[in-house]
């Protein structure tokens, strides 16, 4: 493996490739390897474009807000400053916080306002993220003025996110901190950034239901209730049945216990806490560097081809758009040898961003205390920049945090969607289906009809009289449908619309600000 990495990213190989590329360019010959990328990163890279929702907020792709109940909060500027910065910060629970700051305020000033608003004690794991003019994500530097870092604005839009994923969630002392970690991981899984095997996704979803809804009561709760939640991008009916079955096994867990179990399960995911960055090798093909608590992973497409442990990386430099790593490895005789690896990035700014992220990860997870000396430069962070890690390390956050006797916070409810059975019944009626297609909201629900009975268009108010109509489904699945062996499920007296009104009432009650809802045949077409 090490030979392959030296052959691909070695300094001499990069020099030979550069000379060959220059010769081909002078001769007017192109190389397809210099063109578009081959393959993609194993996960969403940090330089990728975040999907933006109206208002500047970033939500999971194809989804929307994960929770409901987030309201708009305004924090006025302190003092008598006339010139102010207007910043909008989107929290993990969907709340939008607008903050007025002095003109020359630094990133630390804004971060302090946010954590004070949240009443957050374990602040070292979190940060504020923003998009630059090239749609590349960056972390707000606490030591620099906001205006010098953010060129898009005012108003300056940022997102409060988990920056360092704890390698051991049991070290998180505050229940509120663990709750924020769960929200971040739910965002990562729902957006597709964090890949999750089927069985693990089922367990995590069941723990979410246990934390939010409590005990699974069979007369009241059904797999149809599970379909009102979104846990993964491609959620199926069979998966919802498995989630419901697993949910029943977690009886007795409190919300705090369920969230801790969620984190202890999620920490074993292969891409948990991996900060991905796209780079190029000497062949011009795309690779991905993943920053982790243990070291730097190297991916070719979805395949992991190497790992550099932090103790083995002795130097890391950057110059313009080239990043250089010096790694110490043992040869066949047990002697240490230095190997130099060179990576290329699209621009000097992107290269510096990767270098800064690597320095911060190394300092946070590997050091006990950050270096406070400004004159002496360590071998690891040498050349090219005056940047120094100024925060606290994970060791300091774990051993030096003060504990509060009591702390209270509100868990926001998840956004609810029309249940699968209701969506299926409505979509099966050709009259109502045509009405839905004419709406301005093209995505009333994310489910496709599971059966298509022969209903004449002249029957505008067709609705089934029994839930057993699903037995006529032509969709064959390996797992039985949850309607087959549930004879105790009864249709409500008010029909299926009554359940949908309940979903709407739940979302309406959870909304904190103004909203607009459009009805057609008692069906909410705008959530």
Curated annotation (Swiss-Prot):
One GO BP annotation of this record: positive regulation of keratinocyte migration
Cell compartments where the protein resides: Cytoplasm; Cell junction, Tight junction
InterPro entries xref list: Band_41_domain, EHM2_FERM_F1, Ez/rad/moesin-like, FA, FERM/acyl-CoA-bd_prot_sf, FERM_2, FERM_central, FERM_CS
Composition bias, Polar residues: 467-481
GO MF terms held by the record: cytoskeletal protein binding
Mod. after translation: May be negatively regulated by phosphorylation.
Region (Disordered): 23-47, 400-425, 455-493
Main localization category: cytoplasm
GO cellular component terms, A-Z: apical part of cell; bicellular tight junction; cytoplasm; cytoskeleton
Gene3D superfamilies (alphabetical): 1.20.80.10, Phosphatidylinositol 3-kinase Catalytic Subunit, Chain A, domain 1, Pleckstrin-homology domain (PH domain)/Phosphotyrosine-binding domain (PTB)
Domain FERM: 85-369
Chain intervals with Basic residues compositional bias: 413-424
Keywords: Cell junction, Cytoplasm, Phosphoprotein, Tight junction
Subunit structure: Interacts (via FERM domain) with ARHGEF18 (via C-terminus); the interaction activates ARHGEF18.
Stated role: Up-regulates the activity of the Rho guanine nucleotide exchange factor ARHGEF18. Involved in the regulation of the circumferential actomyosin belt in epithelial cells. Promotes cellular adhesion, migration and motility in vitro and may play a role in wound healing. May have a role in mediating cytoskeletal changes associated with steroid-induced cell differentiation.
PANTHER family noted in UniProt: 4.1 G PROTEIN, BAND 4.1-LIKE PROTEIN 4B
Name this polypeptide is given: Band 4.1-like protein 4B
Species: Rattus norvegicus (Rat)
Underlying gene: Epb41l4b
């Amino acid at each position: 493996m090490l030979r392959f990495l030296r052959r691909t990213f070695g300094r001499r190989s990069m020099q030979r490739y550069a000379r060959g590329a220059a010769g081909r360019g002078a001769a007017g010959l192109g190389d397809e390897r210099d063109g578009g990328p081959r393959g993609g990163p194993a996960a969403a890279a940090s330089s990728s474009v975040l999907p933006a929702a109206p208002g500047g907020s970033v939500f999971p792709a194809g989804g929307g807000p994960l929770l409901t109940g987030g309201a708009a909060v305004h924090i006025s500027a302190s003092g008598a400053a006339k010139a102010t910065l207007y910043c909008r910060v989107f929290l993990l629970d969907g709340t939008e916080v607008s903050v007025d700051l002095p003109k020359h305020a630094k990133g630390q000033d804004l971060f302090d306002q946010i954590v004070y608003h949240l009443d957050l004690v374990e602040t070292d794991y979190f940060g504020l993220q923003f998009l630059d003019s090239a749609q590349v994500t960056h972390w707000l530097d606490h030591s620099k003025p906001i205006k010098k870092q953010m060129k898009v604005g005012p108003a300056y839009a940022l997102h409060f996110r988990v920056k360092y994923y704890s390698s051991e969630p049991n070290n998180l002392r505050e229940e509120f901190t663990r709750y924020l970690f769960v929200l971040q991981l739910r965002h990562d899984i729902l957006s597709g950034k964090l890949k999750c095997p089927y069985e693990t996704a089922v367990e995590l979803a069941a723990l979410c239901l246990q934390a939010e809804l409590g005990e699974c009561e069979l007369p009241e709760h059904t797999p149809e209730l599970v379909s009102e939640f979104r846990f993964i991008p491609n959620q199926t009916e069979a998966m919802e049945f498995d989630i419901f079955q697993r949910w029943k096994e977690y009886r007795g867990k409190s919300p705090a216990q369920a969230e801790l179990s969620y984190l202890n399960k999620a920490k074993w995911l292969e891409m948990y806490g991996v900060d991905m960055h796209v780079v190029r090798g000497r062949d011009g093909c795309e690779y991905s560097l993943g920053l982790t608590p243990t070291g730097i992973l190297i991916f070719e497409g979805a395949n992991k081809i190497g790992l550099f442990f932090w103790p083995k990386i002795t130097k890391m430099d950057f110059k313009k758009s080239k990043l250089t790593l010096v790694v110490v490895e043992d040869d066949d005789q047990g002697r240490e040898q230095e190997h130099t690896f060179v990576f290329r990035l699209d621009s000097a700014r992107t290269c510096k961003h990767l270098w800064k992220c690597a320095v911060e990860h190394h300092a946070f997870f590997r050091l006990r205390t950050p270096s406070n000396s400004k004159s002496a430069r360590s071998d690891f962070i040498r050349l090219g920049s005056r940047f120094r890690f100024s925060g606290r390390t994970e060791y300091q956050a774990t051993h030096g945090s003060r504990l509060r006797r009591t702390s209270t916070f509100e868990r926001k409810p998840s956004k609810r969607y029309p249940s699968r059975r209701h969506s299926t019944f409505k979509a099966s009626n050709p009259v109502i289906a045509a009405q839905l297609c004419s709406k301005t909201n093209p995505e009333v629900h994310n489910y496709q009809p599971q059966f298509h009975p022969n209903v004449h268009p002249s029957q505008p108010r067709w609705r089934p009289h029994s839930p057993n109509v699903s037995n006529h489904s032509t969709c064959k699945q390996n797992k039985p449908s949850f309607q087959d062996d549930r004879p105790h499920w009864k249709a409500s007296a008010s029909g299926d619309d009554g359940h949908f009104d309940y979903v709407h009432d739940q979302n309406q009650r959870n909304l904190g600000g103004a909203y607009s809802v459009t009805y057609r045949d008692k069906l909410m077409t705008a959530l």
